[in-house]
Each structure stands twice: as structure tokens, then as C-alpha cells.
Amino acid sequence: MGQKIHPLGFRVGITKKHQSVWFARFHKHQYAQSVLEDRFLRKNLLKLLPQLFQKKLNNSPNMPKISHIQIVRGLIPYEIGIQIHAQNCHMIKSAFEGLEVQPNFVHNLLKNHLILEKNSVKKTSLFKNAGENIELSLTAESTNDFDSTEKKRGGLNRKGEQSLNFKNSTKKTMKSNVEKRKKLFARFHQRFLGKFIVVKNGKKITKKFDSKKQLSFKNNLLSFFKKNLQERRTFRKNKFQTSFSKSSGFSKNQKNRETISLKQKAFLNFVDSKVSKANLSKPCTKFVNFYMSQTNLSFLNALKAEMNYWNQYFENSKTEEIQKFGSFRYLPLGSQKKWNLLRFKRFEKLPLPLLLKLFKALQQKALKKLERLRKEYLVFGKFSKTKTFSYYQRVRFLQNLKKFISLRKNQNSLNFSQSTFENSAQKTTNQKFALKVASLTEKSFQKKFSKIHEEKNTIKFIDHLQALVQQHRSKNLFLYLATISESRQNLKKIQQFTKQQSDFLFGISPKTLVGLTNEEKQEILKNKVSKTFFKISQKNASQKKNFQDIFVEQLQKQRTICEKNIQLTPKISIQFYSVKAQDFQTRASAVADSIVDDLEKRKAFRGVIKKAKEDLMRTPKVKGVKIQVSGRLNGAEIARSEWVRAGRVPLQTLRANIDYCYKTAQTIYGIIGVKVWIYKGYTKTRKPTANSPSVLLDLL
């Protein structure tokens, strides 16, 4: 017969089941344990839930029907989320009451029941007090505002005088800092930036090197020592005497020459060399500068003429359209859609910083475009009409965008000023809104606490599932050895960290514990730790928590996770999703279940498949169906597969919304496999919104 591969990854020997070998790679991402656990949970849930429904409801028409069970896993391996999609979800929780549980779980259940009842009593009292406090605060704040206005009219307190003195001192320090910065900038300008001149050509600003200005002594000295030794010697013999006699105020005797330092000699020599070089290069630089200035002027004049031409062209086309149609309908010929001004309607929803970024990016692109036009003009001496027209459109769009941003800024400033005036009125409205929220939350909590019995049943069911998973993990312990070792290592690290940072976390310094007995140390540690945890538990979500509180909470969570992983106990959460009757009929799992029931009742498979297909095609949402049945059909000796299709079922398109289910029917003749595909149209692709980046990509 050979070997078959199990869908989960087992290589199963048909004759020798004890020789089944695991061959898939499961060391990464703990794939083995998650797949086995999911399969195990799904099997148990599909067995257990129908039994509970029959006990409670006894085949009544309101009995909940499960469409499918989804198991979701988070990043943390011990967390398991179970999503049950079914009809009449409110009946499922009541059905958990008939679950037979071990006596150990009953003790935990009673504890949980007491905790829930206590919380219900506390929460109702808290919400009543909160409503009274908010009403009192409304009256108190009105009186406080009146008192504050009277204090402002009267004289200043001591605190006010101190604040004025502090403000004056801060102003003085600010002025001194500004003066210091100015001096530093002036020194920097003298030393380093003195050799550059800022030149403005139209709207373009550039920096040019000024050859007339003196170089710094350091640069001269470096360039001097780069010369050869022979050149230096000849340079000193020829130039030193003349330069020294003209510039220095010393005597011409040999004694004074010997006393002068080498640095001074080098400086004097290079001043003369610089003057001589400047005199030689003056005519060349003058010619180049004059030629470039003339070409730039001619380029700017030509570009202005082109821009004026295109501006007149736009105005003429606009007037013609207004005369014909009575409004400006169409852009002139050759204009691009992306530079259309109607685009600003989309920009209304965009935030202001994003618009500023867009403006800067477009400005840089426009400068690059201008540089290309200048190069083309230098080479050919003319402009291409299409390029100048595109540049004109870009510049026109930029000008309008600048105006649009300025308008947005003015609107924001006006809104801000209005909000400051309306703050007092907003406070009262906010407080009224808070009262409404408090009343609504109170009602919601009352609903929840009225259904404590159902919550108790769900806790019982979760405990039962946790016990089942723990048994499964203990059987397959070889798959969980790596997680256990990792969690032990993490626990040790957490313990070391808490010991090192005990002063920051709990306020326990090792110096205070010196010289005490072990019993006294334990008592002090217990008291400090219990106090910190009590403070953290008292703080609600509305109150702001310190960095210390958040750190302690996270450490406690990590510790519990590690301990649970070592004990092989998972954290299971159950969520119920109600499914409508129309949606339930078009689910592949429900259709497969109905086919399996009919086949197990020994009905003819062709009639069953045909009926299921016709019923599905009558529903409006379904656009295609395919049903396949394989096995010993109608008790035939040779197994075969038969399938029926209606409409379209595109199995290779990714956008197709196809619901699929596979189930087995256990008949007298053997197992019959049932596969159902239901095609419900294509999934909707999202259109680009105003906030999406695809709106701005074509501009850049």
C-alpha cells in the first residue's frame, strides 16, 4: 500500500501506526505545538458543544447552530483566542451550565462568583458617587471663576511678585545669550566666511569667492610649506629684502633680520606672492564673470517673455470659453491634468504640515527644471515650447498652492482665537457630556452584572478547556521543552533585574536591610511590595500612572507568562459572533453539514448534491457553487469522486471571495469526503482617500 502523508506533517504508515514519524520543520515559530493544539481544540469543541446544546434545549428550533470556529494566536505563545461564529449566541452561554466539571474547578468557580458580585456592588456605588461629584463640581467651578476674576482685579500676592521677578531675570539672561551668539557669529564670519560674497541674480541667490580679500595666515603657511625646498630658498633670497623693507617698521640692519621669527617672514613673503598672482589673473576672471552675467541676463529676459506669452494664452482661452459657454469649462490645449487647480478640493482634508512638505518638494523640483532650461538655452540659444509651457503650469500651481496654505494658516489662527474665548462655555458642555457618559456606562455595567450567572458559566467552560489543553501538552511534552527552558531563563533574568532595581521599583534600598534578621527582612519586603501593588491597583485608567507603576505592571505580566508556560497552562479567551439566518445558509460549513447528515441517513448522493446546489443558487449573494463528493458512493465496491458546479468558481484569482469547507460523512460502507466551494464575488479594493499618499505621488 505504501505510505501517505498526513495533512499536519506526519508520515503515517498505514500498517504500522507506531512507526509514524514527524518530518516537518517545527523548531522555528513553534509551529508543531500550535497546529496540534488548534486541531485538538477544534475537535473537542465540535464534539462538546452539540452535546451541551442537546442537554439544555432537546432539539428545539431555537437551538444554536455553529457555522465555524476560528482559533487566533497572539505573539505570546500561551495566549489562545477562540472565536465561535453561530446563530443564537445568547443561548450558548446558558448551555454551558450543563457541563460536568471536576471538584477542583468548583472551588475556583465559587471564588470567581464572589469576586464578580463584590465588583458589581462596588461599581454601582462608585458610579452613583461620581455623578454626585460632577454635579457639585459644576456649581463649585462657577464660584471659583468669580473669585479668580476678583483676585486679578485686586493687588498681586507674594507669589505674583516672585513670578514677576523671575520673569525679569529670565529676560535678562535671554538678552545676554543673544548678545553672546551675535559676537560668536561675528568672529566666525571674520575668520571663515570673510572670503565669500552673497550674489543675487533675480530670485536665485549664490555664493562667490572674493579674490581681493586676504587669505588666512594658516592657509598661506600650509601652501607655502608644500613647495619644494629649492623654490623656498630662491623665493626668500629674492623677495624677502623688498617685502621686509616696505612693510615692516624694523631697521634694515642684519641684527634685526635675525631676530624676526619664521612665521612673520612667511606671512610677509606670501602677501607679496598673492598680490602678484592676483594681478596676473584679474583680466581672465573679469572676462568670465562678465560673460556669465550677460548670458544669465539674456536667459532671464527670454524666459520672462515666454512666461508672459503663456499667461496671455491662458487669459485669451479663458475669455473665449466664457463668451461661448458662460463659464470656464475646459483647460487650454496641451495643459496637463495634474496641474489643474480643481485639485485643491482634495487638499482641504490634508493636514497643514503635509501641505508645507509638498510645497517644499515641488519648489525644489521647479528649481531643477529651471536649471535644465538654462543649460538648454546656453547650448541651443532657444527654448522648446512644450517645456516652457509645462514649467509655466508648474509655477502657476505653486503660486496658487502658496496662497492656499496662507489661507489655511489664517483659518487655523482664527479658530484658535475663537476656541480660547469659548473655553469657559466648553467646560460646562464637557461636564454635561461626562455626566451622560457616566450614566450610560452605569447602565452597561448593570446589564453585565445582571448576567453574572452566564459569566460564571463561561469561566467554568474556559477552566475545562484549560485542563484539556494542559493534559494534551503533558502528553506531547517533547514539543514544549524549548518553551519551558526559555521561560525559566526569562524568569531568572526578571528576578535578577528586580533585585538590582529594587530601590526604583519598590523603594527598598539594600543599606536599610543591613544588620537585620531574615524574618525582619521578609516582613519589610512584603510590606513594601504589597503597598506598591495596592497603589497601582487603586489607580484607574483615567488617572495618570508613573513610569515606575508601568514598569512594575509589565514585570508582573512577564512573570505570570513565564510561570504559566512552565506549568503548561494556557490563557484562553472566548468570543461569540452572531450570524444571521440568511448568512448562515450561504456558509460552506453549514452546507457541508447538511450534505453529511443526508449521506449518513443513506440518501442518494446525486439528489443531495443537486438540491444543495439549487438552494444556494437561489440566494442573491451567491454567484457560483461547486460540490464534490468522493468515496464508496451508494455502497459501490470501487471508490470514485463525483462533482457538480453551477455559475463561476474562479479558484486561481486572488481577489475572489470563496468560502470553502471539507467534512467527512461516516457511513456503513466507509468514509465519504465532502468538499464545498461557494463563490460570493470579488473583494472590494479600497479607493485612494484624501489622506492616502497615492493622491500626491503624481505631483512629485
UniProtKB/Swiss-Prot annotation:
Lineage per the UniProt record: Eukaryota, Viridiplantae, Chlorophyta, core chlorophytes, Chlorophyceae
One of the GO BP terms on file: translation
Gene that specifies this protein: rps3
Alphabetical list of PANTHER family matching this protein: 30S/40S RIBOSOMAL PROTEIN S3 (PTHR11760), SMALL RIBOSOMAL SUBUNIT PROTEIN US3C (PTHR11760:SF19)
UniProt keyword annotation of DNA-binding present: no
Entry keywords, A to Z: Chloroplast, Plastid, Ribonucleoprotein, Ribosomal protein
A GO-annotated cellular component: cytosolic small ribosomal subunit
Chain positions covered by the region annotation Insert: 88-196, 282-587
Subunit description: Part of the 30S ribosomal subunit.
MF terms in GO: RNA binding; structural constituent of ribosome
CDD domains, per database record: KH-II_30S_S3 (cd02412)
Homology family: Belongs to the universal ribosomal protein uS3 family.
UniProt keyword annotation of Ribosomal protein present: yes
Subcellular location, record wording: Plastid, Chloroplast
Family annotation (Pfam families): Ribosomal_S3_C
Protein's recorded name: Small ribosomal subunit protein uS3c
